[in-house]
From Swiss-Prot:
Highest taxon in the source lineage: Eukaryota
Organism whose genome encodes this protein: Saccharomyces cerevisiae (strain RM11-1a) (Baker's yeast)
Known catalytic reactions: L-serine = pyruvate + NH4(+)
Protein name per UniProt: L-serine dehydratase
Keywords in alphabetical order: Cytoplasm, Gluconeogenesis, Lyase, Pyridoxal phosphate
EC numbers on record: 4.3.1.17
Enzyme class: lyase
Length: 338
């Protein structure tokens, strides 16, 4: 049986203890992807499509190269394993040892280089890939988020949601918002692509959630043009991109999306609460979106409307494997989370 680079994930109605007697929230569980996050969709799609093109051209199998702080590298490694491709991942020194082991266990060669993702990426592209090219190999560079083919892969999440709502006899006009966490804008861009393809981009607002300290989208919106962050300080390291993809920034304004910025303390509290409530461990990048389930007043405020009993909000639980429960407890203690 051929392995696939991504799976159709459950869309589950969940009741949150948030002071409301009804539940509006349907959660899309991307943590169940082969690579532990939504990144399996887009990165797997890029690798599969590029490999098929290389084979059709007679170039042979690709040598795949990924730079990542963790989740993108794991997605690349698991996708390559499903296609029997060699994969090299460069991670910065800040990457947790358990994440390095996860990527290695998925079959990739891991090189640790640089103090942050930018230095790891520079080394990957200008040293490792240059060396491989000299050997005559066909190489593929996998960016963590800023690639249109990756967005195309991520867009399948919207197709699935529409199909799953239909299976549950839920009409699309009942959907009042779709909530996702935003770092560099890869998932957000894919969602916009999927909504647009299904003629829903102007009908269903996307609520983009960031954490203070890596809120590059919100800061760009306030300035009126994309900015680059010199420092990334949030505990939600999977959202820590110094810039926002141009397509994401342009789409935000085009389709009237909404921006929310949360504190690290709020997000960590949600991660611990969600683990206690549902026995799911999510990292802060994922907890950012789930926070709105526990605090629907934030959602109503940003949408400037009440959410009623028959209304539905879709939450993308984007996944991620960068933190254990012990990591969450330790970070919460450091930040005095009550």
């Amino acid at each position: 049986m051929e392995m696939t680079h991504y799976e159709k994930t459950p869309l589950i109605r969940q009741v949150f203890n948030n002071g409301k007697t009804n539940s509006w929230f349907y959660v899309k569980h991307e943590i169940l992807q082969p690579g532990g996050s939504f990144k399996s969709r887009g990165i797997g799609h890029l690798i599969r499509k590029s490999n098929e093109e290389a084979l059709s051209e007679g170039s042979g199998k690709l040598a795949v190269f990924s730079s990542s702080g963790g989740n993108a590298g794991l997605a690349a490694a698991t996708a390559c394993r499903s296609m029997a491709l060699n994969c090299s991942v460069v991670v910065p020194k800040t990457t947790k040892p358990r994440m390095v082991k996860k990527i290695q266990s998925a079959g990739a060669k891991v090189i640790i280089h640089g103090d942050h993702w930018g230095e790891a990426d520079e080394y990957l592209r200008h040293k490792l890939m240059a060396q491989e090219s000299q050997h005559g190999s066909k190489t593929l560079y996998v960016h963590p988020f800023d690639n249109e083919t990756i967005w195309e892969g991520h867009s399948t999440i919207v197709d699935e949601i529409i199909e799953q709502l239909k299976e549950n006899d839920i009409s699309l006009p009942r959907v009042k918002a779709l909530v996702c966490s935003v770092g560099g804008g890869g998932l957000f861009s894919g969602i916009i692509k999927g909504l647009d393809r299904n003629h829903l981009a102007e009908k269903i607002p996307v609520v983009a959630v960031e954490t203070a300290g890596c809120d590059v989208l919100n800061k760009s919106l306030k300035k009126g043009s994309p900015v680059t962050l010199e420092k990334l300080t949030s505990v939600a390291t999977s959202l820590a991109s110094p810039y926002i993809a141009s397509f994401a920034f342009e789409s935000f304004n085009k389709y009237g999306c909404k921006s929310v910025v949360l504190s690290d303390q709020d997000v960590l509290a949600t991660c611990l609460r969600y683990a206690d409530d549902y026995n799911f461990i999510v990292e802060p990048a994922c907890g950012a979106s789930l926070h709105l389930c526990y605090h629907p007043e934030i959602l109503e405020d940003i949408l400037e409307q009440k959410i009623y009993e028959d209304d539905i909000v879709i939450i993308i639980a984007c996944g991620g494997s960068c933190m254990t429960y012990e990591d969450l407890v330790k970070a919460s203690s450091t930040l005095n989370v009550s």
